[in-house]
Amino acid sequence: MIRPNTTILPVNTTGKTAHSTDDRPDAAVLLPSVGLLALDRQYAVLREEIRIAIERVCDSGRFILGPDVNELESELARVLGVPHALSCASGSDALLLALMALDIHPGDEVILPSYTFFATASAVTRLGAVPIFADIDPLTFLIDPADVERKLSKRSKAIIPVHLFGRTANMDALLLIAKAAGVPIVEDAAQSILSTWNGKCSGSLGDVGCFSFYPTKNLGGIGDGGFLTTTRDDIAKSLKLLRVHGMEPRYYHQVVGINSRLDSIQAAVLRVKLPHLDSWTTARQSNAARYMELFSQYDLEQHVTVPGDESHGRHVWNQFVIRVADGQRDALRAHLTTCNVGTEIYYPVPLHLQKCFESLGWQKGDLPETERAAEETLALPIFPELTPAEQRTVVGRIAEFFRVPQARQATDASTHPQAAAETLDGPHFLRRIKAVGCADDVRC
């Protein structure tokens, strides 16, 4: 009987199955399949609670901005330590609404990283403003405050740091720069819910925080959704008006807004998930620490650079992104695909080199660290339900690609349970969690 999540590789023309160590001509290898994501595992645990929540909304007939939306907003504000949390239709809309609330006009400049998802820049250009791209810190992949300062001008009207992959940007430096220049900060926290900087949650540090409920996020819905946070009453009032066509009261429009409301069914499902977010985050942190341990055990440091340990807070690991130097990233990814290991490249083409921004005049070489990251980075599976065995498979396949000998310490619990407990689940492993800066006493 074939185990679930396995794939039989066909025999190739040389008479050996791909990646087989068996020289028999008819040998076939069963390779475990490790997906980049496994949303079905999360759903399976919560299936009944989600069903009840959806039926409650359907029975109420309140499908738009219903009671569950109000409750979710209150719960998010409490969890993140902010006075205001306002939901909307997507993380992309959250960015657009934030800039609208800050009264960004055509011709204004907004400084942001080029190494980010497209929505960060598209929100700027939709308002006729100009994205000014800053380079990144090569250790963290986050916007470089020094380059932000260099890019400031009299036309600068906002700064958007992106808390990429689950790590908060250097907000101390950015806040000082923004204050001196008199410009607001919009935090793109789409990938970083519950991450912290010096004890404060992402989304609570700048003027506005923007989050996404896209299903692959750490707190994901069953479709699109997003929300914004702010400590400023005036911005909260504007956001609440802008998301409903600027309408207050009904059919009386004070400003030209957009239609960006969170469905009640999405809110109901997210309320089921929110109490689990902290434990899911802890699981992601444990998985990150285990990867660190495994890469060390396989002596892969000369081939692969794992995420840096520098942190001033809680890293929530929306993605685990490694660097693969010497032009081998794409070949490694192809190898892992053949081995049924899911990966992704975030992001293969920096925004300043995208075709749609050609008119801005950016050239290759303008942002060297951003461009190097786009050529070298590869995301590995990091979802909360990922098992230690699956992680050993992932790192083992990477070691296979680089022809690295077997790991120094046995980590297969099925054959060496005591060694596995000592190396991955024992005190040394727990120390590794602290070492990567992702287990602290902060619970926001």
What do the predicted segments below correspond to?
Residues 187-222, 249-254:
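Conserved active-site segment immediately N-terminal to the catalytic lysine
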Residues 60-109, 123-127, 132-135, 200:
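Phosphate-binding glycine-rich loop
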Residues 86, 111, 132, 185-186, ...:
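Structural detector of well-ordered beta-strand residues that form the stable sheet scaffold
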Residues 21-28, 40, 52, 69-74, ...:
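PLP-dependent aminotransferase class I/II
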Residues 123-124, 177, 201, 218, ...:
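Hydrophobic/aromatic ligand-binding patch that stacks against planar heteroaromatic rings
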Residues 100-189, 196:
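PLP-dependent aminotransferase-like
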Residues 2-62, 442-444:
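N-terminal "arm"/small-domain region of PLP-dependent enzymes with the aminotransferase-like
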Residues 211-212, 226-232, 271:
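Short beta-strand-to-turn element immediately C-terminal to the catalytic PLP-Schiff-base lysine
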